[in-house]
Amino acid sequence: MTQSTSVSKGGRVSRKAKKNPDGTMSIVDHLRELRTRLLRALAAIAVTTIIGFIWYEHGIPAWAIGPLHVPRLPSLGEILKEPYCSLPPSARATFSADNECRLLATSPFEMFMLRMKMGGLAGLVMACPIWLIEIWRFITPGLLKNERRWTLSVGTIAGFLFVLGVVAAYLVLPMGLDVLLHLGDSTQISALTGEKYFNFVIALILVFGLSFEVPLFTAMLNLAGVVHYEQLKDKRRIMIVVIFIFAAIATPGQDPISMLVLALTLVVLMELALQFTRIHDRRAARHVSEWEGLSDDEASPLKVAPSSIPAAESIYDGDHKGIAGGGDAHPAGGSGPIPKPSPVTAPTRAPSASESPTPTPSPAPSDSPTSGSHHAPPAAVLRRGPRSWNDSTGDNDGKPGQDTIQSSSFDDVL
C-alpha cells in the first residue's frame, strides 16, 4: 500500500493510501488499518452507549405511520426487572407507598454506576452489527473465497445460537427466582439490590448464551477432522452426565429449574450436533481415498497385479549362424551359442627409416613335448617408463624382473 500526497486549494496537504494491485500490505499498513477499524467500532459503541444510558430510564413512546402502529417500548430497567416484579408480592419486599416494584440501592453511587454499567452493555449489544462488520472487513483480505463463506456461515449460526440462549435465559429467569425466593419465605422476605440482581441476570444470560455455542464447536471439530461420529456415539451417556454437572455448576442461582432447562436444552442441541457429524462423516466416506487415513510414516497400499515379462525376440531368423558357424555375432537379445573369443596377438611396432630391422631370435627348445606343429610364440619383453615394446632381451645385464618382464607368450603377460 502506497501513499499519494495532494495539496488542496486552502493549502492543506492530504494523504490518501493507495492499495497495491496484488493486495499485499506492510506491517505499518496493517496497524493503520486496525487503528481505523477500532476507531470506527469505538465511535459506534460510544453513540449506542449514550442511547442505552437514556433508554435505561426512559422508554420509547408509541408511534404510528399510516396503518403501521408501533407500541410503546418499555425502558431497559423495566425489561430487566420484569422477571423479579412478576413474582407475587408476598415473595418480595415493597418499600414504596404505591406498592410499585423497585430494587434497592444501598450506596449513594450505586444507582449511577449501575445505570452506566447497563447502558454500556446495552450499547455494546446495539453496536454489535457495526463492530462485527469492522472485524469482518479487517480479516476478509487475508481469507480465501472458501474461507470467507465458511466464516460468514459460522458467524451467522453462532450469533443465532447466542441470541437463542439469551431468550431462553430470560424466559427461565422468573421460574428460577420463584423457586429460590420461596424456599424460606416463612422466615425471610427478599429485598434484592439492583447491583446483585442485575449481576445475577447478566451472569445467567452469558451462561446460557455461551453454552449454546458448544454444539457449534463440536460440529466445527468434526468438519476439521478432529472428532468423528463413531467416537462421540460411544460417549453419549458420558456427555449427558457432564452436561448436567456443568448446568448445576454454571447456573448462578443454583436452582433446579434453571439447571434442568439449561441441561435439557444442551442435550437436545448436542444430539443435533451428533446427527450433523453422522451425516457429514457418511458423506465424506463416499469420497475419501484409501491413503487419507494413513499416518505420515505409513506406506499406502498399491493395487498392482504382478505380470510376467515376455521373452526377448531376436531380429534374426532361425537359420542365422553364429561366429562358430561362420556367421556374424548376435546382437543383444539374439538366440544362439556364445562364440569362442579370438586369440590376442602381440602388438608390433613398424621400424622407422633410420632403424634396421632386428632379427627375431629363435625360441629356446622346450623340454615339454608338444603335439603337432604348434609352437610357443617368441618371448616378448615389456619395458618400463617411456620405452616401447621390443623383441630383444633388454639391458640391465640380462637380469629379468628389474626393468624387464619376460614371458613365454603374450597371453602370459596379459
Swiss-Prot record:
It is a multi-pass membrane protein. It comes from the Bacteria. It is found in: Cell membrane. Keywords: Cell membrane, Membrane, Protein transport, Translocation, Transmembrane, Transmembrane helix, Transport. Residues 403-414 have a biased composition (Polar residues). The chain crosses the membrane at residues 45-65, 119-139, 157-177, 200-220, 238-258, 259-279. The Tat system comprises two distinct complexes: a TatABC complex, containing multiple copies of TatA, TatB and TatC subunits, and a separate TatA complex, containing only TatA subunits. Substrates initially bind to the TatABC complex, which probably triggers association of the separate TatA complex to form the active translocon. HAMAP family: TatC. Belongs to the TatC family. This is Sec-independent protein translocase protein TatC. It comes from Corynebacterium kroppenstedtii (strain DSM 44385 / JCM 11950 / CIP 105744 / CCUG 35717). The gene is tatC.
